[in-house]
Amino acid sequence: MSWYDDRPWMDRYEERVRRVGDIPARTALDMFESAVVTAGDGPAVRYLGGTLGYREVDQLTDGIAAYLLENGFQRGDRLAIYLQNIPQFVLALIGTWKAGGVVVPLNPMYRDELAHILTDAGVTAIVCSESAWADRVGSRASEAGVRIALTSSELDIQTSNDERLFRTVTRARSENVPDLLEVARVRAGATMPDPGLTPEDIALVSYTSGTSGVPKGATNTHRNLTVNSAILRLYEDKPAGAPIFALAPLFHITGMVCQLLTAIDLASPLILVYRFEPGVVLDALERERPIFMVGPSTAYMALMAHPDFSGERFASLEAVMSGGAPLPPAIVERFRELTGKYIRNGYGLTETSAPCVVVPPDLEAPVDPASGTLAIGLPLPSAVVRII
């Protein structure tokens, strides 16, 4: 047996984290259904003054799944979600899985790449904002052969009408495209057939950023997603029901696994603020008191540079993580100086369903003296990592 096969870094983990073999094989839908039983009417999503409970999300997603099936959506079909961090993203995701489908989460800033991805992924249905449909999605979806379209507005559910976010946002309903929430509410609580999903079925086709060419779709199975979210839950050892802040975009695999699915695994509320606006994020942190968040280093830099920044706004956070971009040691030290919180680094890929290497909760990452680079951590128990 080689040194690598011995995996000596596992000794740095607590026993609860090493027991990856005890994580049950399940689908993301199984995980959500367990959360509904655990949380009941407790909050699933909080969005700028608006709240959806777990039981309500369960009923609304039954309605979305029923609509999809009524319109010819079949098991294994792909539905693209082209939305910012709003509750309708969560509804579309779970509704698609209830219909037996595969979700294709898309960066809502994509324009030129959109037609390629819709065609390459074989997308049958799409959910997007009203303005995006009118501006760019409608024509590209038609060209790609998308048969089912639903739109939604970022103004729905929230009550803040915060001008920092919504000053230029207006309603732009398209006459022939149904509204996601209306469809869901009309059919809420519909009796749904078992979609027959297994842990080895594909849950997501997640497109890479295209740094080496055109974006390419990586397949993430239900087991990939549920194991990584469960590992993160064990790793962080956070209580059920504790709020998770969505700093990273949900369309990104980090936001999907480390925020959305981890919140579901904990039967916790996911805190959404539409898009990253530093002042809005700072206000939400103080108001919602989350225990965990993860985001790129650029987000932490922007927060610290904002005139309303104060360490007290971060007081509730028990874990702060960074991924998706290099994390300069100076940012880690400055953030700790201002907030008392240490940003733990992590590394993952779209293809690995987010984290595969993370700095453990009780350790700090060393800095390479030659390059000044911060270490990314240790392999998770669920990952096999080789440097070649």
Model-derived segments and spans:
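Conserved AMP-binding A3 loop
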Residues: 53-55, 194, 203-227
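Structural core segment of the AMP-binding/adenylate-forming
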Residues: 70-71, 102-183
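Conserved AMP-binding/adenylation subdomain of ANL enzymes
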Residues: 226-243, 251-292, 306
